[in-house]
Regions:
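Surface-exposed loop/turn motifs at beta-strand-loop junctions within extracellular Ig-like
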Residues: 116, 595-599, 744-746
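Feature activates predominantly on carbohydrate-active enzymes
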Residues: 47, 95-320, 367, 371, ...
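Aromatic, loop-rich ligand-recognition surfaces of beta-strand-rich domains
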Residues: 645-708, 712, 722-769
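Flexible, acidic glycine-rich loops studded with aromatic residues
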Residues: 379-394, 400-551
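Acidic, contiguous N-terminal accessory segments
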Residues: 13-154, 375-382, 386, 390, ...
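Bacterial N-terminal signal peptides
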Residues: 2-8
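Active-site neighborhood of glycoside hydrolase catalytic domains
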Residues: 285, 289-392, 399-407
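Short, compositionally stereotyped local motifs that mark structural "simplifiers"
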Residues: 2, 27, 508, 514-663, ...
């Protein structure tokens, strides 16, 4: 994607010899107190003074000088001392958090003080972002101010998966620089996968000799076609130590992850004796989760885990070591004599909560946790480690929503919140997925990331104390380059960091946040980072007006840029209709909108709208919509718009454990003879087609008469994942109220991994004609 839009927000003062700083930064500081008058003039030749003999403070001073030079061209000197003029970095501030800082500006000096070197670094980041980018400025005026700031959470993380796709040393360092700009202090490095082992383990050299290389990679979403190109690579232990040191200079701790006992097919390709069948295995060429996992009944497995973790501990000084624990299929264990013997020897029995194989996984995780504890480290695992019993000192990373985190906090275990529906940055960030790079699915726009509140209201104040951090994740099945990785995380990382750092009361103004983020993108552009530009597009909202029977359209932009639109599907220009204060649609059309700016126009939005007799009519749901997929609620079914294969964009709503049952009020007796609805099927996600549809009519909304019904068989494994269109026709009938019932799958078939459970039913529109 192009970067043209960031330039449009460059302040006019960039052409002037003196620029003016602006303290409206991301993340928003806790307290900003502006003085009534006065300012400090930042110009070449000024000196940054730092605490004598403190190498970390010296490095901080050098960072600040480099940032200012890069962003403005102003050259600053660095010297030991505790001056009363110029720029002063000092320790000694008393604060509850070691990462707190105070930034104070007056006519004589700029002072950043903190309890620790890390706090000084965050003060430097705030100053850097306040100065922003003014290349060629002769000076920068810093208005007098006092900023007092500290982070909400002590753990502020961002993950990068290098198992599916690997990145060079320079690219990893760039990623760390991105984290530092956003006040993130934990780099979670996902180093092992079915598709590749990425870290040198000297006791097991085949892990990298064999396990780091796959013969080829599947094209797209497990299409069955492969690219025929060998893919591989790994980091030596010395390279990993270099990354640890680079991150530490920026006050970022690297947390390594070795995912076990699942996600281990690459390791099994190297050491097949560690698997239940003994192989042969290959480094996996496709995406998803392999059934081939470490054999929990093999004595060598526990020793392998301990040996690997011993070398990981030696490389990484982090307080936490991540052992994964997620998505471990148990099918091999169920038929493995060694695993079943281990279950018997341990006296494990299944119960109504967990199978005996799930309890066996808990045994493996607890062995890993015991080893880490004995070696002075703490363990993190994904929320699946709750299944079968939580290891005594484990920290839970809650990714499947918040339920795991809530359960762990109630058990008085530390929790890091990373729910996929808010913080998985491999999800699409735009509804128009055809114009986006291929992604894993989902829909996670900037606003949803920003809306996340990590403290569950279900927890008491005492229990909430165990929520110690927030993290976002970038899984890389469909992200082969750092440029694409940057596109997926920027600027969503800005929304993440404000959630991690800023107090909740500072997160009430999303539009203000967007304006601050637009300023931040100047630094992205200067650094050459390939950020997404969706925040500069037209924000279009289309809502049914059940009073008028029409659709009301509102449009806005981040900077009030003029918007032009067309209704016939053609590309808008400045000769097209100009959007003023709302738009009403009462007929089928293709609405396209564009923001016009001197520096470059926005991308063009596109919404296809169809009208039927049910469009913009009052609708009532008789059974509840599934909360995570409620979006705009029942009106989604009468808004004239249909969804695509991505059921998470807000164009679909879902039903789970109950059926879709809707009554549409046509407002007057109206003749109809057909009903069409569509379902979105993605069997791997437990989303299934309807098992039956009934159409009923009524004149009084009390007594209904059935006019059409159709039953559908349970889906077969070979049935396609796609959108299914169901049309029921019937003799013309004049009626006011129409009840449409679509039955959901209540018993997933035996061929599916979710057999016996209910499935999701996704519906996008009810069309009456």
């Amino acid at each position: 994607m192009g970067l043209a839009f960031a330039g449009m927000l460059m302040a006019s003062c960039t052409d002037s010899p003196t620029a003016v700083a602006d303290y409206q930064v991301v993340p928003m500081p806790l307290e900003i107190t502006a003085a009534s008058q006065g300012s400090f003039l930042l110009k070449s030749g000024e000196t940054i003074c730092y605490t004598a003999g403190n190498e970390k403070m010296k490095k901080n001073a050098e960072f600040l000088a480099a940032f200012i030079k890069e962003q403005t061209g102003i050259a600053l000197k660095v010297a030991e001392g505790d001056g009363e003029e110029g720029i002063v970095l000092r320790l000694g501030l008393e604060a509850d958090s070691p990462e707190a800082y105070r930034l104070k500006v007056d006519e004589r000096k700029v002072e950043i003080s903190a309890p620790s070197e890390a706090g000084v670094f965050y003060g430097i980041q705030t100053l850097r972002k306040s100065v922003s980018v003014h290349e060629g400025a002769g000076a920068v005026e810093l208005p007098a101010v006092e900023i007092n700031d500290s982070p909400r959470f002590s753990y502020r993380g961002m993950m990068l998966d290098v198992g599916r796709h690997m990145f060079s040393m320079d690219e990893i360092k760039t990623y760390i620089d991105m984290l530092a700009l956003h006040n993130i202090n934990r780099f979670h490095w996902h180093l092992s996968e079915d598709q590749g082992w990425r870290i040198e383990i000297k006791k097991y050299p085949k892990l990298t000799e064999i396990g780091s290389k796959r013969s080829e990679t599947v094209i797209g979403r497990n299409s069955g076609q492969y690219d025929g190109k060998p893919y591989g690579g790994f980091y030596t232990q010395e390279q990993a130590r270099e990354i640890v040191a680079y991150a530490a200079e920026r006050y970022i701790t690297v947390i390594p992850e070795i995912d076990l006992p699942g996600h281990m097919q690459a390791a099994l390709a190297a050491y097949p004796e560690l698997g239940c069948t003994g192989g042969p295995y290959e480094v996996w060429r496709m995406w998803g989760i392999s059934d081939n996992v470490l054999c929990a009944g093999n004595d060598k497995t526990i020793q392998f885990i301990k040996d690997v973790l011993a070398e990981i501990i030696d490389i990484f000084p982090s307080e936490y070591i991540h052992v994964g624990g997620d998505e471990c299929p148990k099918v091999k264990w169920e038929t493995c004599p060694k695993c079943q013997a281990r279950i018997k020897a341990l006296g494990i029995k299944g119960d109504s909560k967990h199978s005996k194989e799930e309890y066996l996984q808990s045994y493996v995780i607890q062995e890993a946790e015991k080893f880490l504890t004995e070696n002075g480290r703490s363990m993190i695992g994904w929320d699946e480690i709750l299944e079968g019993g939580l290891a005594p000192n484990a920290t839970v990373m809650s990714w499947r929503g918040e339920a795991g985190g809530i359960e762990a906090a109630r058990q008085q275990h530390n929790v890091i919140m990373t729910p996929n529906t808010y913080l998985y940055f491999d999800y699409y960030q735009a509804k128009d997925t055809d114009s986006e790079p291929l992604a894993i699915g989902g829909y996670l726009p900037m606003e949803r990331v920003y809306s996340y509140e990590p403290m569950p209201s279900a927890l008491s104040p005492e229990e909430q104390k165990f929520i110690t951090g927030v993290q976002a994740n970038l899984w890389t099945e469909y992200i082969p380059t750092m440029a694409q990785a940057q596109y997926m995380v920027l600027p969503r990382m800005a929304a993440l960091c404000e959630t991690q750092w800023s107090a909740p009361e500072k997160k009430q103004d999303y539009q203000g946040f967007l304006k601050r983020t637009a300023r931040l993108t100047r630094i992205y552009q200067l650094k050459g980072w390939n950020y997404a530009t969706h925040i500069f597009d037209v924000n279009v909202n289309i809502a049914p007006n059940t009073e008028t029977g029409k659709l009301d359209v509102t449009a806005s932009t981040i900077d009030d840029a003029p918007v032009y639109y067309t209704l016939d599907g053609t590309e808008p220009t400045t000769a097209s209709s100009k959007y003023e204060n709302g738009l009403t649609i009462d007929a089928a059309c293709v609405l396209r909108m564009m923001a016009v700016r001197p520096e470059g126009n926005s991308r063009i939005t596109r919404d296809s709208i169809a009208f039927s007799k049910s469009t913009a009519k009052p609708i009532t749901m008789l059974q509840p919509i599934n909360k995570p997929y409620e979006f705009k609620g029942a009106t989604t079914l009468v808004d004239g718009m249909t969804g695509d294969r991505n059921y998470k964009t807000g164009r679909w709503i879902a039903f789970y454990k109950n059926d879709m049952e809707a009554v549409i009020d046509l407002k007057e007796a109206t003749e109809i003879s057909s009903m069409t609805l569509r379902t979105c099927v993605e069997k791997g996600d437990w989303t299934f087609d309807t098992r039956g549809i009934t159409v009923e009519v009524s004149d009084d909304n009390k007594t209904f008469k059935k006019v059409a019904s159709e039953a559908y068989p349970a889906m077969k494994e070979t049935d396609a994942n796609q959108i299914y269109t169901h049309t029921l026709t019937f003799d013309p009938v004049k009626t006011r109220y129409v009840k449409v019932t679509a039955l959901s799958e209540q018993n997933i078939p035996a061929w599916h991994g979710g057999k016996g459970n209910p499935g999701f039913l996704f519906v996008d529109e009810i069309v009456l004609n």
